[in-house]
């Protein structure tokens, strides 16, 4: 039997079991765990290649075939790092296995026919679209920026560049919720809105959920008191929606113990749980050890670098409408910026105590850098802390699964949308992101929404081929016209679905209901479920987890940075 070398095979069909890839310019290595394709029966499109009539392409009608097949792709997801053909049917993932022509090929699990489009995955990495759960909808241009970075779902609140939205991720009240839902109909992005959760009586909260909010946001700038927390969580329990919280930095209505007690064991998503983004000073970080708390970070503190502390003060003053001429405002800002807790945050991510990572878009965070900052943190931790248990000198597969879960499956579970998005699994919406390994996490090649190409790095449209410069990100057909309505989702509550707000508001996008938001716990956070006992020294701010001091040095140099960007 004729054989080819591993190098030649990888060059033709992409890496196979046992082959390793470096992620961008990081120190992270992945190793393919399993290859679902069949050696000698690989399908590949092109002149003189396999996917031709009577060869790798069958004669079957479209009802029996995939609409799209991604050939020979390396998948990175929470469940594995594998090589497979990915099939898409009616906008959803229909098969992860071996595509081809079953009339002449063995082991076929998905059929290629005359109605099948092919996307070459050889040498590419495919991941699920990112999910950013901390969005201030300050300007609609954020959506394009996020999409081009590989984010396909945005959850948060706001009404545009209003003072309240600059600081808080809330779309307050039924009128604003309706207007925002009508506006986001025009964008190729899955979106869910959070209403304002700060009230001590339920009526004003319940009406926001009924109007279409998928959850409520408690923010200290609106008054996150124990009474407001208790009321908001009660409404969430009644409506099967999630609550996100930015706690009381000034400790005006109680300390971290007061807030944890107000939760009464009920599930809640704590934003920027380290505290630089806001929350009980100096020890809100303790919350990540609670079984009912689903903790996330925002990206301005990710990872801890020599510049992190300096840039935060000015960001804080702008975002929270503070005045540099008022001493109390300066003191408020400075109380949130602590070297010790930011350093500990790096380690708590690496150990799986912090479960998610998001942006805090235009409100201290950068909407297009969720994915970059995640992998920069992973690289920094490998360099400073070495291998994680489960990893080997050959690969960092477990660490990679831990970190990718922070912006894919775990935010999906937290906000009740994991039945639709958040991973590459059969039956889920085909929101997929393609990366060349050298550009992984930095610059995607293709972004699919609902099985159609919504955005891509595209060359000069007047060129004779697609690749000549200038190459930059452009919306593709699923990102324009009616394609948007059929390739993107608007998430709403069950009560809003019952009220048929889609028709009442004149929405054209498909709508999906959030569910199972209240029964989840920290134990459901995949690869990120550690619940340490944390204490913070009130004078030195040193963080102790299960008796161990958590500290690390700031990074002076990061991967995925200047090497990839001119500006």
Swiss-Prot record:
The modification N6-carboxylysine is found at residue 217. Ni(2+) 1 binds at residues 134, 136, 217, 360. Its main location: cytoplasm. SUPFAM superfamilies: Composite domain of metallo-dependent hydrolases, Metallo-dependent hydrolases. Ni(2+) 2 binds at residues 217, 246, 272. One of its GO terms (molecular function) is nickel cation binding. One of its GO terms (cellular component) is cytoplasm. InterPro entries: Amidohydro-rel, Metal-dep_hydrolase_composite, Metal_Hydrolase, Urease_alpha_N_dom, Urease_alpha_subunit, Urease_AS, Urease_asu, Urease_asu_c. Its cofactor is Ni cation. GO terms for biological process: urea catabolic process. It comes from the Bacteria. It catalyses: urea + 2 H2O + H(+) = hydrogencarbonate + 2 NH4(+). It is found in: Cytoplasm. Carboxylation allows a single lysine to coordinate two nickel ions. Heterotrimer of UreA (gamma), UreB (beta) and UreC (alpha) subunits. Three heterotrimers associate to form the active enzyme. HAMAP family: Urease_alpha. Belongs to the metallo-dependent hydrolases superfamily. Urease alpha subunit family. This is Urease subunit alpha.
């Amino acid at each position: 039997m004729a054989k080819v070398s591993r190098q030649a095979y990888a060059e033709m069909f992409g890496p196979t079991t046992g082959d390793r890839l470096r992620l961008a310019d990081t120190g992270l290595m992945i190793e393919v765990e399993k290859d679902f394709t069949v050696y000698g029966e690989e399908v590949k499109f092109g002149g003189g290649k396999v996917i031709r009539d009577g060869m790798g392409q069958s004669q079957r009608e479209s009802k029996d075939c995939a609409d799209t097949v991604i050939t020979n792709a390396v998948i990175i997801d929470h469940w594995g790092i594998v090589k497979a053909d990915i099939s898409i049917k009616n906008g959803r993932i229909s098969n992860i296995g071996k595509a081809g022509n079953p009339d002449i090929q063995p082991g076929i699990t998905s059929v290629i026919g005359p109605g099948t489009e092919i996307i070459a995955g050889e040498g590419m990495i495919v991941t699920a679209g990112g999910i950013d759960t901390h969005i201030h909808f300050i300007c609609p241009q954020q959506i394009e920026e996020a999409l081009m970075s590989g984010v396909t779902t945005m959850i948060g609140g706001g009404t545009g560049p209003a003072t309240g939205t600059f600081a808080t991720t809330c779309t307050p009240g039924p009128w604003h919720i309706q207007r925002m839902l009508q506006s986001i109909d025009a964008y190729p992005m899955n979106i869910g809105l959070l209403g304002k959760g700060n009230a001590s009586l339920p009526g004003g909260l319940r009406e926001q959920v009924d109007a279409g909010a998928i959850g409520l946001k408690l923010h200290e700038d609106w008054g996150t008191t124990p009474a407001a927390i208790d009321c908001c969580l009660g409404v969430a329990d009644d409506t099967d929606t999630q609550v996100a919280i930015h706690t009381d930095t000034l400790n005006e209505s109680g300390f971290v113990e007061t807030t944890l007690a107000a939760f009464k064991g009920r599930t809640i998503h704590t934003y920027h749980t380290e505290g630089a983004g806001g929350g009980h000073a100096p020890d809100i970080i303790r919350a990540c050890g609670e079984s009912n708390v689903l903790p996330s970070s925002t990206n301005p503190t990710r990872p801890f670098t020599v510049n992190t502390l300096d840039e935060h003060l000015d960001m804080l003053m702008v975002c929270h409408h503070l005045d540099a001429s008022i001493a109390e405002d300066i003191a408020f800002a400075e109380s949130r910026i602590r070297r010790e807790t930011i350093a500990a945050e790096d380690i708590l991510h690496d150990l799986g105590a912090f479960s998610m990572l998001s942006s805090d878009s235009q409100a201290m965070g950068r909407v297009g850098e969720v994915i970059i900052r995640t992998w920069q943190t992973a690289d920094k931790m490998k360099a400073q802390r070495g291998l994680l248990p489960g990893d080997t000198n050959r690969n960092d597969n477990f660490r990679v699964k831990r970190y990718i879960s922070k912006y894919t499956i775990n935010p999906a579970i937290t906000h009740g949308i994991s039945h639709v998005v958040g991973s590459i699994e059969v039956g889920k919406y085909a929101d997929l992101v393609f990366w060349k390994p050298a550009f992984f996490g930095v610059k995607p090649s293709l972004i699919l929404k609902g099985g159609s190409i919504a955005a891509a790095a595209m060359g000069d449209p007047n060129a004779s081929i697609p690749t000549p410069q200038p190459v930059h990100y452009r919306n593709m057909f699923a990102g324009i016209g009616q394609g948007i309505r059929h390739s993107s989702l608007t998430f709403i509550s069950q009560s809003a679905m019952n009220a048929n707000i889609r028709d009442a508001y004149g929405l054209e996008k498909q709508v999906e209901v959030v569910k199972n938001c209240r029964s989840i716990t920290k134990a459901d956070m995949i690869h990120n479920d550690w619940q340490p006992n944390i204490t913070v020294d009130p004078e030195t701010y040193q963080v102790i987890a299960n008796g161990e001091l958590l500290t690390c040095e700031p990074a002076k140099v990061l991967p995925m940075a200047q090497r990839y960007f001119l500006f």
